[in-house]
Regions:
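Nucleic acid-binding interface residues in structured DNA/RNA-binding domains
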Residues: 2-102
Length: 102
């Protein structure tokens, strides 16, 4: 069954992303839990992949559950580094240091 993605849901996700402080990151799952949709981390990712259609949001601050950055978002790493976010390796943020504590 397909999930219906309404404009309200899109803006709810984007509003949650807007709350992530500079220099910190959240996971897709954290954002899903924050909006009361615990099992919808993939839906969050889908919405964020189209976020530029809705305005300027700090989507670069959202990573997967292990801290990995998005493979199709080449400027994500540079933006995070510019905010002082440390990486454990080439593609993974150090979540112990930079995970947003909600």
């Amino acid at each position: 069954m397909r999930k219906i993605v309404t404009e309200d849901l899109i803006y709810e996700i984007l509003s949650a992303v807007e709350e992530i402080p500079e220099g910190e990151v959240a996971t897709y799952g954290q954002i899903a839990r924050l909006i009361g949709r615990d099992k919808n981390a993939r839906l969050v990712g889908k919405v964020l992949s189209r976020a530029e259609d809705y305005g300027d949001y700090p989507c670069h601050r959202v990573v997967n559950h292990s801290g990995r950055i998005a493979p199709n978002f080449p400027e994500q790493k540079d933006r995070l580094l510019a905010e002082g976010v440390a990486f454990k390796n080439d593609t993974c943020v150090d979540l112990e240091k930079h995970r947003w504590e909600i």
